[in-house]
């Protein structure tokens, strides 16, 4: 199942679609939620993962065809991609560089010599009759990615070891037509460059598996290695699950984080049931995921003999021993480092908010610029910037159900609005309304904040001061109290949140020109 495409903040952050399934007489319900999940005593969970990552190159791995995922079918395919006789592969150096960047980021040992091999099988998605991969001498080995409780939502620190990283070509895409039973083959994906990253079976909890996948995707996207678009197949995963040291079961072609977690959780429960109640042991086999349960596709006895042998048309890759060290010096700061920085002074963001900004580079840069203007130049509190970006700015886009677009209002203009609120030239309520109007109206984006305030008559009350202002506020509050005695009774009986209703009515009466805090103080004084 696909994850929700739009990420909401605060209490809705990183919500995923949930589902459940039933298996065997025990009626075990499997949901995508892992809150409170624990392996059963005596049945330890053991898991490894293989992630196939499409590289974000201009051209394909062994041809000059464009690597364009959104193109019309079969418009980005050369003679070699179609598997025509007489065509010769030539390695794309850009793909090699991106694969090396990924290997360095995962702290892997780069092989000084690596080579390509042919993996033979016959299927519609492989026009050559074999896949070019790296079976005998992969590009990199012995890497790792560390998970920490504060940043990765795991219970304890854990290092996940990467067994190897290999460079290989993707297959063609099969599109099944349920109406007439035909299959269309799109060769645009054939020969698209991939890296296959294989971990050791180090996962002992589903939270570790989820954290690793999210962190890996964030890392590859941040480095420009991959688009990170799982929905369109930029990353595809296979997981290997075993229980209590028994045979492992591979679940192939999982296309989202929620699918990975649901499939692994279901498969663990299935194996535990077999061990508890079955007369036969868990078989070593390959299974697929149908959205509710895993389905057997082939057993160990049915395993394909791929007849690997070296590809004589491609020379070995020979790299200088210092290539890993040299490349590491060219990498930007990694997501974990940036998140850590945003959680410390002078920013002091929550981890979930810092991660959201880092995973959206345009928004990250926007926040840093706004922070510089508001905090460094105008000496306002960091809390002001954090609240405006996380709750007001992103929140306004979410309320309108439109993607966040930082180009709608530049940082100088948003800073101007924030500063005018701090100087009490406009109330916070009016400022929110004005921001929403700017997002909705392209014409208003051309005007300055002061001009917009004048145009919509949103300026704070400036012609009444001191005791006169207090008296005016008291009069409005008294009228609201008289009009809503039932709400006042609720407040006096302990339902203090009901005061927000009264504040809202008062704000409406004054068209948002008076600060809501002033009304709150007065209501509390009058109600007692």
Swiss-Prot record:
Cystines in this chain: none
Any idea where this protein resides? Mitochondrion
Keyword field? ATP-binding, Ligase, Mitochondrion, Nucleotide-binding, Protein biosynthesis
Q: Which InterPro entries match?
A: Asn/Gln-tRNA_amidoTrfase_suB/E, Asn/Gln-tRNA_Trfase_suB/E_cat, Asn/Gln_amidotransferase, Asn/Gln_tRNA_amidoTrase-B-like, GatB, GatB_Yqey_C_2, Gln_synth/guanido_kin_cat_dom
- Taxonomically, the superkingdom here is Eukaryota
Q: Which GO terms describe its biological process?
A: glutaminyl-tRNAGln biosynthesis via transamidation; mitochondrial translation
Substrates-to-products reaction catalysed = L-glutamyl-tRNA(Gln) + L-glutamine + ATP + H2O = L-glutaminyl-tRNA(Gln) + L-glutamate + ADP + phosphate + H(+)
Q: Which GO terms describe its molecular function?
A: ATP binding; glutaminyl-tRNA synthase (glutamine-hydrolyzing) activity
What EC numbers are recorded for this enzyme?
6.3.5.-
Q: Mind naming one GO cellular-component term on file for this protein?
A: glutamyl-tRNA(Gln) amidotransferase complex
Q: Which PANTHER family match?
A: GLUTAMYL-TRNA GLN AMIDOTRANSFERASE SUBUNIT B MITOCHONDRIAL AND PROKARYOTIC PET112-RELATED, GLUTAMYL-TRNA(GLN) AMIDOTRANSFERASE SUBUNIT B, MITOCHONDRIAL
> How does this chain assemble?
Subunit of the heterotrimeric GatFAB amidotransferase (AdT) complex, composed of A, B and F subunits.
Task: Extract the NCBIfam families matched here.
Answer: gatB (TIGR00133), PRK05477.1-2 (NF004012)
Q: Tell me the protein family, please.
A: Belongs to the GatB/GatE family. GatB subfamily.
User: Function of this protein?
Assistant: Allows the formation of correctly charged Gln-tRNA(Gln) through the transamidation of misacylated Glu-tRNA(Gln) in the mitochondria. The reaction takes place in the presence of glutamine and ATP through an activated gamma-phospho-Glu-tRNA(Gln).
Query: Please, what other remarks does the record include?
Result: This protein may be expected to contain an N-terminal transit peptide but none has been predicted.
| Name of the protein in its database record | Glutamyl-tRNA(Gln) amidotransferase subunit B, mitochondrial
According to its UniProt entry, this protein's organism is: Clavispora lusitaniae (strain ATCC 42720) (Yeast)
> Which gene name does the record give?
PET112
